[in-house]
Amino acid sequence: MDKNKIKVLIIDDSAVTRNILSLELAKYPEIEVVGTAIDPYIARNKIVKLEPDVITLDIEMPRMDGITFLEKLMRYHPMPVIIIGSITDSGYQTALRFIELATTETVNKPRFIDSY
């Protein structure tokens, strides 16, 4: 790992989304994807081991939703977070809750991304 690069951990249950984000971020020489996780429990262990500078976090995942994970993360290991998820009209309040919990950025995931 290059210490001058921004280390990113991608947390998303969709293999397609993890792959697309990894490929897109690889285009930037100053960014290094240090790992991926399919759920918050795996992510927790990887955060401790890999020490990312920033994480991308899906809103809806199995075993623990993104809000619950973000609340725990900000309490015990605060760090920059970019939310990646499908934000519909009904999910607007969810997006606001993420912002309240210190989300660095929220990115709306295109609805077709998981259908590939």
Where do the protein language model's features map onto the residues?
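Two-component/phosphorelay signaling modules centered on CheY-like receiver
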Residues: 3-6, 15-35
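Active-site residues of response regulator receiver
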Residues: 12, 58
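Acidic catalytic/metal-coordinating carboxylates
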Residues: 39-42, 64-68
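Conserved phosphotransfer cores of two-component systems
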Residues: 48-50, 73-79, 101
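Active-site beta3 strand of CheY-like receiver
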Residues: 50-56
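Receiver (REC) domain active-site loop signature in two-component systems and cognate sites
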Residues: 61
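Alpha4 helix (beta4-alpha4-beta5 surface) of REC/receiver domains from two-component response regulators
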Residues: 68, 75, 88-115
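Hydrophobic/aromatic residues positioned on beta-strands within the core alpha/beta folds
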Residues: 84-86
